[in-house]
Regions:
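Ubiquitin-like/PB1-type beta-grasp interaction modules and other compact soluble beta-rich domains
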Residues: 1-97
Length: 98
């Protein structure tokens, strides 16, 4: 079971509270987790990744085990602590202002 923490605006869109728990078939990668997340919550399609390119949207970052995974390849394995469910994958929305 993989745990995912979404930013507040995406939790509201998906109508979830707190962490999301997902079953991921195969290796635990960013792509596999996001595929499972979008399959379970279709309203999130296009909000985390671009529809066509499947690249991370510019103002979102991925963190796990105190590491920024935002620039890791989408098929790179996630840390073991995330794959085992001990630690969550954090999807963080940027805060900007002027």
């Amino acid at each position: 079971m993989i745990r995912v923490v979404l930013p507040a605006h995406l939790r509201a869109l998906a109508r979830v509270r707190g962490e999301v728990e997902l079953e991921v078939a195969g290796p635990a990668t960013q792509r596999a987790v996001l595929d499972a997340l979008e399959a379970r919550y279709p309203m999130l399609r296009g909000t985390i990744r671009e529809h066509v390119t499947q690249q991370r949207r510019p103002f979102l970052r991925f963190f796990a085990c105190e590491e920024d995974l935002s620039h890791e390849p989408p098929d790179a394995p996630l840390p073991d602590a995330v794959a085992s469910g001990a630690e969550p994958l954090l999807i963080i929305g940027a805060i900007a202002g002027g």
